Design a protein with these regions (language model features):
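Non-catalytic connector elements of ABC transporters
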Residues: 33, 42-167
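Internal alpha/beta loop-helix hairpins
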Residues: 1-56
Length: 167
């Protein structure tokens, strides 16, 4: 509910996986969904997003849905949940460089609050079981990490209406 109006009705899974709008997307889930402005492009029938100067192909069901909805190239708000980011390395062309500003140890996972080069703050959630002791020790304030995400886990919102482009 926002401003006295119900925003979406559905099962918890439906609301989490396919939020109707940006408000619902950021409200459901902890930590909240990361959102940032970027462009969606269509090249040879394939969709790409271009956050922070990297090019990531939209794939899987999300690509099919964009095609079926007839979504065209343009400015969007891209949503990526913290658990959908993965650590990468500098050699990956889809890697986004970020500087760690907060490392929250939550027991079975780390919540890394990072700043992208242009100043956007993102939250990256990493299961501690997936890290070596060396990796864990390197994830400290001020260190640079590289993160990326798969094309099948993205959410796409209209920057004017804030509605999900796939609903």
């Amino acid at each position: 509910m926002k401003d006295g109006f119900i925003q979406q009705v559905g099962t918890p899974t439906e609301v989490f996986d396919m939020p109707l709008n940006l408000f619902v997307a950021e409200f459901i889930g902890a930590p909240k969904m990361n959102t940032f402005k970027t462009t969606l492009t269509v090249e040879d029938g394939k969709y790409f997003v271009n956050p922070y100067g990297v090019k990531i192909e939209v794939n899987g069901k999300k690509a099919d849905m964009l095609t079926n909805k007839g979504v065209q190239s343009g400015e969007i708000i891209l949503g990526v949940r913290p658990e959908h980011f993965v650590l990468s390395d500098e050699s990956n062309p889809a890697a986004i460089p970020c500087k760690i500003v907060v490392n929250e140890m939550m027991g079975s996972e780390l919540h890394l609050h990072v700043l992208e080069d242009n100043g956007d703050r993102l939250i990256v959630r990493i299961p501690t079981v997936s890290l070596t002791d060396e990796q864990r020790a390197s994830l400290v304030y001020g260190s640079t990490i590289y993160v990326t995400f798969e094309g099948k886990v993205m959410h796409f919102f209209d920057p004017e209406t804030q509605l999900n482009l796939l609903v």
